């Protein structure tokens, strides 16, 4: 979105590290994304932030685990904005505001915002592993229990939790 590159590290973050999260005391923060990483970040940030708004392009049910949706909806200080995307951010040296666009109506709204955490667009960079470990159709490495139904697993024992198709390689 417009303005994000200029404010990266100054209110716009691509992760919720402990050091940044500890600075969110009593802040109203925005988490962008609708998959598990965004939901887990929202839960984590809700411990200290005044409020957390999850901005979701579609709905949580489209890409988040059911258990996590239940946890989010049980937390009083987490709000959902489905069918919404970030149009732009603004600030002079630090994030000050966010402009959100509702995808179903095209309506735009501006909000004061000092911190925005982005968890979208996971894109694997695993081409170099072609022929070495099993990857799914999207390029993500298949590991642990997910290997059981894939011909790449050759041992009699089941794969360990994060083990790839190369036994012993996690």
Range-by-range predicted roles:
Residues 25-49:
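Rossmann-like NAD(P)H-binding beta-loop-alpha module
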Residues 115, 168-170:
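Conserved catalytic-site loops of classical short-chain dehydrogenases/reductases
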């Amino acid at each position: 979105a417009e303005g994000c590159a200029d404010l990266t590290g100054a209110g716009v973050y691509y992760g919720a590290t402990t050091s940044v999260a500890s600075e969110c005391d009593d802040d109203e923060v925005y988490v962008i994304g609708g998959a598990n990483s965004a939901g887990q970040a929202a839960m984590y940030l809700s411990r200290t932030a005044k409020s957390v708004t999850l901005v979701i392009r579609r709905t949580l049910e489209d890409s988040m685990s059911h258990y996590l949706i239940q946890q989010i909806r049980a937390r009083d200080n987490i709000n959902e904005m489905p069918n919404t995307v970030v149009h732009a951010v603004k600030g002079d040296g630090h994030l000050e505001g966010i402009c959100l666009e509702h995808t179903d109506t095209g309506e735009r709204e501006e909000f004061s915002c000092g911190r925005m955490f982005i968890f979208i667009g996971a894109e694997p960079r695993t081409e170099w592993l072609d022929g070495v470990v099993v990857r799914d159709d999207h390029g993500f490495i298949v590991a642990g229990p997910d290997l059981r139904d894939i011909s790449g697993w050759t041992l009699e024992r089941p794969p360990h939790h994060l083990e790839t198709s190369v036994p012993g390689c996690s």
